[in-house]
C-alpha cells in the first residue's frame, strides 16, 4: 500500500475530486490518485460490460428464417436438414433466454441434434456455420478418438476442453457453445465386430457421453489428457451446451429396409424402386439407430434427427461456385494476387464433381482435386511473368494434363503440352 508523507496535504482523487479525508483509501499512481469509491465504480462497469459481451449472441437471437438465410450463403442444398437445424437451434437458444424465475411448471428440455448423411455431404460445415451465425464458441471432436475410462485414448471431458479453449477459457461463454461430434456411428456396438478397440470405444463411450449430453457439471483437466487425483479441474455445466452429432451410418439403409420389409414385399419392381437410399434415410426412426448399435438411453438424448442427401454432380458444381467462400472463388482470388486470371470451364467443373463422386468423398474431396490440378501452376506462375491467364479444362482433370496458359495478348503458351 502506498504510504503518504505527513507533509503532503490536500491530496485528491484524480477522478472524482474528493479529498483523502472524504474517502476510506486513496491509491497513488504515477502523478495520479484514485479513491476506493472510484475503484469500486470502475469494477462494476467492467463487470457489466463483460456480462453484456458474454450474453450478446444470446440476446440478439436470429429467427429460424434468418438462421437458414445465413446457412444458404455457405451451404448449398440440404434444404430439409437446414430447416430442421434452424428450428432446433432457435428453440435451444430461446430456451436459454427464458431461463430464470419459473412462472409455471413447464420445463423446456434440451434437444441435441443428429445429422445423418454420407461423407462430404456438409455435416461439419452446417455445424460450423451455425456457430458463426450465432457468435458462440464451437468445437469439433472425433468420436473415434474417444475411449472408455481406463484405456488409452481421450476422455469425453477433453471434448469440453476444446470448447473452453475456443471460448478463451471464458466458462460462461463456453456453457452456451456448440460441440460437433463427428463419426458418432463408429461408437455403435456391433456384435459381429471382433475388434477389442470397439469394446472400449463403443458402448462404454456412449455411456460416458450420456451425462454431458443431458446436462451435468463436469470436471475438465485444464491441460487435457487423463484426470489425476491432485490435479486442479475446471468446472463446466453442460446443461446449455448444444451437441450436434454427425455420422455416415453406412449400411443403415438395410436396417430400415428390414423394418419396412412387410410394406415392400409384394410391390412391383417399379414400386420397390421408390425405396432408394435417399427415400429410406428420410424414414429413419429411433428404433433403426438402436438396431444399428446405439443404446436407447443415448438415442433418447438426441431427439432431433436430420438426414442429409447424397450430393449429385449438379449440387457439387453449385458448391464449387455459389457459396460466399466457394472454392473456385478462393483459388481465383489466390491467383489474382499474382496478377493471373483463373478460369474453370463448365466441363472442368463437371469433371471435378464426377471425380469427387467416384472417390466417394463428396464436397470434402473437391479441394484436393482442384489442388492436384493446380499445384504445378501455383509453383511456376509466381516466377513466370508471361502467364496472365490459366484455364482449367476437363482434360486437365480427367487426363491430369497441364492447364491452358495464356499470355497478355491472349496467345496460348503451352499448346504442345495440352494437345496430347
Swiss-Prot record:
Disulfide bonds: none annotated. Pfam families: AAA_2 (PF07724), ClpB_D2-small (PF10431), zf-C4_ClpX (PF06689). GO terms for cellular component: HslUV protease complex. ATP binds at residues 118-125. Keywords: ATP-binding, Chaperone, Metal-binding, Nucleotide-binding, Zinc. Residues 1-54 form the ClpX-type ZB domain. The keyword Transmembrane helix does not apply. InterPro entries: AAA+_ATPase (IPR003593), ATP-dep_Clp_protease_ClpX (IPR050052), ATPase_AAA_core (IPR003959), Clp_ATPase_C (IPR019489), Clp_protease_ATP-bd_su_ClpX (IPR004487), ClpX_bact (IPR046425), P-loop_NTPase (IPR027417), Znf_CppX_C4 (IPR010603). Zn(2+) binds at residues 13, 16, 35, 38. SUPFAM superfamilies: Glucocorticoid receptor-like (DNA-binding domain), P-loop containing nucleoside triphosphate hydrolases. SMART domains: AAA, ClpB_D2-small, zf-C4_ClpX. GO terms for molecular function: ATP binding; ATP hydrolysis activity; ATP-dependent protein folding chaperone; protein dimerization activity; unfolded protein binding; zinc ion binding. It comes from the Bacteria. Signal peptide: none annotated. PROSITE patterns: CLPX_ZB (PS51902). GO terms for biological process: cell division; proteolysis involved in protein catabolic process. Belongs to the ClpX chaperone family. Component of the ClpX-ClpP complex. Forms a hexameric ring that, in the presence of ATP, binds to fourteen ClpP subunits assembled into a disk-like structure with a central cavity, resembling the structure of eukaryotic proteasomes. ATP-dependent specificity component of the Clp protease. It directs the protease to specific substrates. Can perform chaperone functions in the absence of ClpP. This is ATP-dependent Clp protease ATP-binding subunit ClpX.
